[in-house]
Amino acid sequence: MFELVIKNGYVLDPSNRIRARLNVGINNGKIAVVTKDEMFGNVEIDAEGLIVSPGFIDMHMHEDSYNTESDSFDFVISDSMLKMGVTTAIGGNCGIGTRKPVEYLNAVDRLGYPINLGLLVPHESIRYAFGDFNKYEPVDHFYIDGMKEFLQKQLDGGCIGLSLGIEYDPGIKEEEATELMSIAAKNHKIVTIHQRSDGNQSVSSIEEIINYAASTEASLQISHLSSMCSFGNMEEVISIIDSYRMKGLDIGFDGYPYYAFCTFLGSAVFDEGFLEKYNYGDEYYAKLHVASGDLQGIEFNKETFYKFRKQNPEALIIADLLNEGEVDQCVTHPTAIVVSDGLYSNGQGHPRGSGTFPRLIHEYVVNKKILTLDAAIEKITYLPAKRVGLSEKGTLSAGADADITIFALDKIKDEATYQEPFKKPSGIEYVIINGQIALKNGEIIKNNLGRSVRK
């Protein structure tokens, strides 16, 4: 007798190259057995006609806020993650996130969380620990040793790695970047980087961070390449990455299957002259939209855009500027990992935070037929788990963590839009986290089963 049994489902496990009608037995939060044999459980799920997959892993998202005074989380993005089949996510990306990562992880274990969560040490938290620095200026050499000690302490506390957001903090120069990256490398932990710039500066920005990785021997993950290099640069950039990988450098990249990016209006992304990087004229200001909320629907020209930016730097902007073919080229590359870059703020957001993984399957597998189902599932399970070193995630092997997503292939579809970014997807039937049912028939029934993921 098992605590939980999933019966009659079509098990798809890329890590073991399994695709067959099998039963799954679960005990003590772990997968006990995957077999054709009949099994019985205290709780049973009949998965007839459904796909049984390792739980989806999102290795690039932005975690919910944590209030230290009330010792509570404001679950927004994490609930959306659960509803689209995510069982484990990695926050702290792009160099931004919680100022005290280990304290945040401790709260996850103490209070519970909708999904399992790991954190990178965001660069801004390292800088913030030593003062409120000008983001456009380099840090004085005097602070570097202390910053390295702060990073080491967070890594010792179980953080997955380091993240840098060079575009958001353009004052980051070689010394600061490489000194911190060397600490991550010595700890055998990943470094994720949001590169310095995009558009016609993509190639030089990619070469900059690859050089940093080469000099420090860091494992480099280039963040959301799909939104940084889809302006006529994707083929060249991927060629550069592949060539360095062939030389032995540990380089990976990820992307999301949407043709518009989203970030804060006050960030350096929208500094004066940004459209010139994309070889776009002023008419493209009309392709920039407030994500959602009371200010949604404002139509921009150059003058109104910069006036609005000065008044509302925290507004999230949807930039409908990406080349569809290049996004697809990124997402379908054999080594690409698919991520959401999910971010919600003040009721604003991009639909990727609620729809990325169902969209990948519905659009790329079912509609466009440019990915096989096995390849799509691998990009959101085994590949991210392997990339960040989570051996008990992303697989249905016996002994692995019982994190499982069950979905209907004929129904799975992203429903979130730019007007309704929080709308849950269709077709996600069950989500199992640490051996217990967190979501049933598309509805959350327990949102505290997740625990911290540490390395």
Per-segment meaning from a language model:
Residues 9, 328-335, 340-341, 404-453:
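C-terminal cap of metal-dependent C-N hydrolases
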Residues 29, 385, 391-415:
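Structural signature of the urease/amidohydrolase superfamily beta/alpha-barrel
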Residues 1-40, 411-418:
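N-terminal metal-binding scaffold of metallo-dependent hydrolase/deaminase domains
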Residues 61, 69-163, 249, 258:
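Divalent-metal coordination cores built from histidine and acidic residues
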Residues 129, 135-141, 147-160, 164-167, ...:
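Active-site neighborhoods of metal-dependent hydrolases
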Residues 55-66, 166, 191-198:
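Histidine-centered catalytic micro-motifs
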Residues 9, 29, 49, 60, ...:
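Divalent metal-coordination and catalytic microenvironments
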